[in-house]
């Protein structure tokens, strides 16, 4: 390399290095962390429940933590897609959408205060309703108003869509006299006030309703409960800087160690958090594919060859998910056994 070229090249390399370090520093120096919160109830009710926890997060991370409330789950997913929020509390269904479409990544999972490994979807009716079962609902659907959940809700939409409707060969939007989509709280209050005949709900929201509106909770009757749903995940955007991810993970996974911290998240019905990853969504992905399969299998508008092709594709995806789920369960069992062995050795 000639001396003149060297004189030109070295400052250029140094300049590029400085520019790169400035970009890295800019990435790491976040003034405000934006936390998305799905709309299980009205935002004015959620703000005071979240504020103590978010204030502790801000103090620990050394940045402002700004909550982002929206009218529906899709708005929180879209906010992550366009980098308007940095992390979010989702249900499993909305987390799946965030991971697949919005550059999200699961890093933690809530642990319920009641010690349960998850929660359950419910169908509720008014206490005085003659409806006593799913069979009663389906038999009288043409005369009933149905309060369905947000389309991106796990317990309010996906789980009942499969277990209550798809497994019985029907689609909720097609069988009722009228169908409305609302958040959990609105659905419950609508049933209590006799504005809808039957609605989706969940056990976590039922506990909150019993604390906030015990008179309304007394007006509800549960006529169906789903299989267990995994606890809710926390999701950050993949583009968040690694230093911030580390600080955030350390804060979240240690939160709940003190009595004061547990008291602050008790209104959210959580005790602490555990580490998690995108594989938490495997059972939810199975459920989504099962629902699609049931829909295709019952679609008379498809010719036989096209139906078989689509079903074969879905079956292959289900087989793959089944293998991944078995591998994860085996790894979890092995880890749990190792933990027991270590504890006994001590």
Please identify what each model-predicted range represents.
Residues 92-102, 165-166, 192-193, 197-218, ...:
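A ligand-binding cleft/hinge motif common to bilobed small-molecule-binding domains
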Residues 9-20:
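Bacterial N-terminal signal peptides
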């Amino acid at each position: 390399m000639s001396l003149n070229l060297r004189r030109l090249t070295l400052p250029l390399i140094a300049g590029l290095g400085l520019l790169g370090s400035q970009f890295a520093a800019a990435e790491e120096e976040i003034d405000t962390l934006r936390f998305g919160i799905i709309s299980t109830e009205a935002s004015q009710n959620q703000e005071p429940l979240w504020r103590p926890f978010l204030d502790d997060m801000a103090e620990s991370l050394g940045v402002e933590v700004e909550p982002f409330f929206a009218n529906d789950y899709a708005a929180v997913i879209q906010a992550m897609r366009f980098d308007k929020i940095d992390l979010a509390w989702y249900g499993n269904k909305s987390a799946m959408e965030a991971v697949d479409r919005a550059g999200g990544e699961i890093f933690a999972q809530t642990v319920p205060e009641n010690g349960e490994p998850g929660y359950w979807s419910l169908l509720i009716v008014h206490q005085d309703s003659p409806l006593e079962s799913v069979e009663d609902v389906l038999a009288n659907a043409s005369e009933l108003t149905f309060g369905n959940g947000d389309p991106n809700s796990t317990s309010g939409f996906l789980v009942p869509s499969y277990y209550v409707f798809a497994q019985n060969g029907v689609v909720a939007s097609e069988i009722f006299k009228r169908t409305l989509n609302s958040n959990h709280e609105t659905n419950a209050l609508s049933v209590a006030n006799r504005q809808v005949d039957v609605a989706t709900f969940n056990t976590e929201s039922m506990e909150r309703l019993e604390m906030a509106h015990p008179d309304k909770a007394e007006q509800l009757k549960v006529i169906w409960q789903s299989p267990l749903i995994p606890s809710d995940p926390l999701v950050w955007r993949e583009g968040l800087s690694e230093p911030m991810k580390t600080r955030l993970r350390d804060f979240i996974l240690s939160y709940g160690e003190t009595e004061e911290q547990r008291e602050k998240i008790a209104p959210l019905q959580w005790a602490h958090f555990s580490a998690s990853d995108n594989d938490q969504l495997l059972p939810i992905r199975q459920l989504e594919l099962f629902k699609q399969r049931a829909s295709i299998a019952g679609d008379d508008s498809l010719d036989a060859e096209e139906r078989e092709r689509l079903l074969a594709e879905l079956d292959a995806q289900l087989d793959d998910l089944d293998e991944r789920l078995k591998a994860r369960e085996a790894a979890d069992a092995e880890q749990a056994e190792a933990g027991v062995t270590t504890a006994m050795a001590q």
